[in-house]
Curated annotation (Swiss-Prot):
Lineage: Bacteria, Bacillati, Cyanobacteriota, Cyanophyceae, Acaryochloridales
Chief site of localization: cytoplasm
Pfam families assigned: TsaD (PF00814)
Protein's recorded name: tRNA N6-adenosine threonylcarbamoyltransferase
Keyword list, A-Z: Acyltransferase, Cytoplasm, Iron, Metal-binding, Transferase, tRNA processing
GO biological process: tRNA threonylcarbamoyladenosine modification
Organism annotation: Acaryochloris marina (strain MBIC 11017)
Length: 360
């Protein structure tokens, strides 16, 4: 299996990693959380500037920590979609420069495919097909992973992503940024049954509800009205109880849909990825429900839930082993359905024919 250096700059983390045989040799992340905290969210222009400042040091540290040099690198992977275009361009430019400088293949990686491959880093023998629940600040999807590069979206949010809802509710409760960890911490002090909040179902034209799609905008509005009702009465807002009730509702909605989807499609394994995969309520609810239905649930370690380059390197290595490489004209895209992943590999670049790697 290929040894791959990867770069990830899709949002506010500047990351580089080296992965070999689904084993992490290094995984370096320069976080910008403290930089964006005063703004209550990620500022794209600020994120791009800090990527430029950090990228060289992060890549150098990844190679140093891996104790590896360029002759041992088989290819360079980079996140190219989806994400903040300015941020993606920093990583893409760095990767292309290294590709030309060291004469290596370029492998563009879809960010969501990276999150799916985070599960392989902890479970190298994970076999397809399986269901992946991707929950992050920008995405909430149920995806059937049929093979490397072959994915089918079965359910998704119709409005806010789960992580986005956490950030917005945290702002309503004056808990700061990022909202996910803040709500998770204070929810432990509250009663998750204190308030009945709407789960957010998607009505179908023919009647009934979509079994796998979600909506969090109504839940967010319900929390807003609840907070305002306490303030209008001049009462203290029960922040811990509201946070616990909100978190419980989100975890319940995601768990119900993931379990039903897995059972309906005959998939025995649910792999969870994305920043919200770190949420304690989601972990507890999904593990309990899955055990009852004799399903296996795989959660990555916390370090692989949030954006990182190890997951990008893992996905890149899988594609490189199959002869999938990207052209130097590879572009940064703000949006791209995961079903179109293979469009990133229109054929091997004439400059870099597919590597003949041993199948160790």
């Amino acid at each position: 299996m290929a040894t791959v250096l990867a770069i990830e700059t899709s949002c506010d983390e500047t990351a580089a990693a080296v992965v070999k045989k689904r084993h992490i040799l290094s995984n370096i992340v320069a976080s910008q959380i403290d930089i964006h905290r005063p703004y209550g969210g990620v500022v794209p222009e600020v994120a791009s500037r800090h990527h430029v400042e950090s990228i060289n040091d992060v890549v150098s540290e990844a190679l140093s920590q891996a104790q590896i040099d360029w002759p041992d690198i088989d290819g360079i992977a980079v996140t190219c979609a989806p994400g903040l275009v300015g941020a993606l361009l920093v990583g893409l430019t760095a990767a292309k420069t290294l590709v030309m400088l060291h004469n290596k293949p370029l492998i563009g990686v879809h960010h969501l495919e990276g999150h799916i491959h985070a599960s392989y880093l902890q479970n190298p023998d994970l076999a397809s097909p399986f269901l992946c629940l991707l929950v992050s600040g920008g995405h909430t999807s149920l995806i059937k992973a049929e093979d490397c590069g072959l994915y089918r979206t079965l359910g998704q949010t119709r409005d806010d992503a789960a992580g986005e809802a956490f950030d917005k509710v945290a702002r309503l409760l004056d808990l700061g940024y990022p909202g996910g960890p803040a709500i998770d911490r204070i929810a432990k002090l509250g009663n998750p049954k204190a308030f009945a909040l709407p789960e957010g179902k998607i009505s179908l034209p023919e009647g009934g509800f979509h079994p796998y799609d979600t909506s969090f905008s109504g839940l967010k509005t319900a929390v807003l009205r609840l907070v305002e009702s306490f303030r209008l009465r001049g009462e203290d807002v029960p922040v811990a109880d509201i946070a616990a009730s909100f978190q419980q509702t989100v975890a319940q909605a995601l768990t119900r849909r993931a379990i039903k989807c897995a059972l309906d499609y005959g998939l025995s394994t649910i792999a969870v990825g994305g920043g919200v995969a770190a949420n304690s309520a989601l972990r507890q609810q999904l593990l309990t429900a899955a055990e009852d239905k004799k399903l296996q649930v795989l959660f990555p370690p916390l370090s692989l839930c949030t954006d990182n380059a190890a997951m990008i390197a893992c996905a890149g290595a899988e594609h490189l082993d199959r002869g999938h490489t990207s052209a130097l004209t590879l572009a940064a895209l703000s949006r791209m359905p995961i079903s179109k992943v293979m469009e990133l590999y229109p054929g091997s670049s004439p400059m870099h024919p597919p590597l003949e790697l041993d199948a160790e």
